[in-house]
């Protein structure tokens, strides 16, 4: 048998040897959650039932590919309710809207379909209940996010936004006999939220915790899955849009959990090949509003660059589904 030293390997043999050590760890769960699946299907079914155009207030979910695909099918996305013509069909996005927006739509005789995620609706109901019971509400979330605007709009006079640890000291004083509770946006980093809540408790000794967790199961599951692959990954690529809160949180979680680097991309072609320089293990995940076809595109991109060994790391199984708005459910026979 003829033995060949490493420096005598042919170019193709050297490439094969290098590729043999390259691997991809794919986080699971990833991608679509039950709320996003319901919201996207709401628009699809509305187009089937009523025909184009169907108007959608804001992006139905925060994903460029999904929005563009639905627009090609006849959905028209508008920033404000008043941009939809009187009497049109209008879908409210998965992020929810305030009572003022509902009234605005009613005044325009719009035929509304509410695609708000049921887990967001749960937080809306908590705000209404605690406001009715005389509480001040500290809402942990990101200023300007549609979900936060809709949730705070349920009781704007008693809801105070907490956008980061640094904002805790900017909150007004609350007397000890004033009832005080914190709630949160559903798509936040679990670890960051707990850091903020710890600071809130330090400042307000009488602050109450909510009866149940507001950060949704899908957000938590995707963060746990990313943590499971991050420490072994030279780089973690998260598929998701820049305006997606939960996708951006996955990048942050990956870095905090030990990834060498982490990047957010909408499409595989946005990956800078320099990110892979020297990398032997690449982690891949996707936000809750990302269809699996975009993840497959990233895996194909990596495969073409020698990352042939693909292993899925599963930390939870998701079986939750949500019913469509009543007007779009199949008729009972």
UniProtKB/Swiss-Prot annotation:
(2E)-4-hydroxy-3-methylbut-2-enyl diphosphate binds at residues 62, 95, 145, 186, 244-246, 289. Keywords: 4Fe-4S, Iron, Iron-sulfur, Isoprene biosynthesis, Metal-binding, Oxidoreductase. The keyword Iron applies. Dimethylallyl diphosphate binds at residues 62, 95, 145, 244-246, 289. Isopentenyl diphosphate binds at residues 62, 95, 145, 244-246, 289. It comes from the Bacteria. [4Fe-4S] cluster binds at residues 33, 117, 216. It catalyses: isopentenyl diphosphate + 2 oxidized [2Fe-2S]-[ferredoxin] + H2O = (2E)-4-hydroxy-3-methylbut-2-enyl diphosphate + 2 reduced [2Fe-2S]-[ferredoxin] + 2 H(+); dimethylallyl diphosphate + 2 oxidized [2Fe-2S]-[ferredoxin] + H2O = (2E)-4-hydroxy-3-methylbut-2-enyl diphosphate + 2 reduced [2Fe-2S]-[ferredoxin] + 2 H(+). Its cofactor is [4Fe-4S] cluster. Its EC number is 1.17.7.4. GO terms for biological process: dimethylallyl diphosphate biosynthetic process; isopentenyl diphosphate biosynthetic process, methylerythritol 4-phosphate pathway; terpenoid biosynthetic process. It is an enzyme of class 1 (oxidoreductase). One of its GO terms (molecular function) is metal ion binding. Catalyzes the conversion of 1-hydroxy-2-methyl-2-(E)-butenyl 4-diphosphate (HMBPP) into a mixture of isopentenyl diphosphate (IPP) and dimethylallyl diphosphate (DMAPP). Acts in the terminal step of the DOXP/MEP pathway for isoprenoid precursor biosynthesis. Belongs to the IspH family. This is 4-hydroxy-3-methylbut-2-enyl diphosphate reductase.
């Amino acid at each position: 048998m003829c033995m060949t030293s490493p420096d005598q390997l042919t170019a193709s043999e050297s490439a094969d040897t290098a590729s043999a050590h390259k691997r991809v760890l794919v986080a699971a769960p990833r991608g679509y959650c039950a709320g996003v699946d319901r919201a996207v299907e709401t628009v699809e079914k509305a187009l089937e039932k009523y025909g184009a155009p169907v108007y959608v207030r804001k992006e139905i979910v925060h994903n460029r590919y999904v929005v563009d695909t639905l627009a090609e099918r006849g959905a028209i996305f508008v920033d404000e309710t008043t941009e939809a013509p009187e009497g049109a069909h209008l879908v409210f996005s998965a992020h929810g809207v305030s009572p003022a927006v509902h009234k605005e739509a009613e005044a325009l005789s719009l035929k509304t379909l509410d695609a708000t995620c049921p887990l967001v609706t749960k937080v809306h109901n908590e705000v209404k209940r605690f406001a009715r019971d005389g509480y001040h509400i500290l809402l942990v979330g990101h200023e300007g996010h549609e979900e936060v605007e809709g949730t705070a709009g349920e009781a704007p006079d008693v809801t105070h936004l907490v956008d980061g640890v640094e904002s805790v000291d900017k909150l007004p004083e609350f007397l000890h006999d004033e009832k005080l509770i914190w709630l949160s946006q559903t798509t936040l980093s679990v670890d960051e939220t707990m850091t903020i809540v710890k600071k809130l408790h330090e400042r307000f000794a009488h602050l109450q915790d909510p009866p149940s967790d507001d950060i949704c199961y899908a957000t938590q599951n995707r963060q746990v899955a990313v943590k499971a692959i991050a420490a072994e990954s030279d780089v973690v690529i998260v598929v998701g849009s820049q305006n997606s809160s939960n996708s951006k949180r996955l990048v942050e979680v990956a870095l905090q959990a030990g990834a060498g680097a982490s990047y957010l991309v909408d499409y595989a072609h946005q990956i800078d090949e320099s990110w892979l320089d020297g990398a032997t293990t690449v982690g891949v995940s996707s936000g809750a509003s990302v269809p699996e076809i975009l993840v497959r595109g990233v895996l194909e991109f990596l495969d073409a660059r020698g990352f042939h060994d693909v292993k899925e790391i599963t930390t939870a199984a998701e079986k939750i589904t949500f019913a469509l708005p009543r007007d779009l459910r199949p008729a009972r026979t």
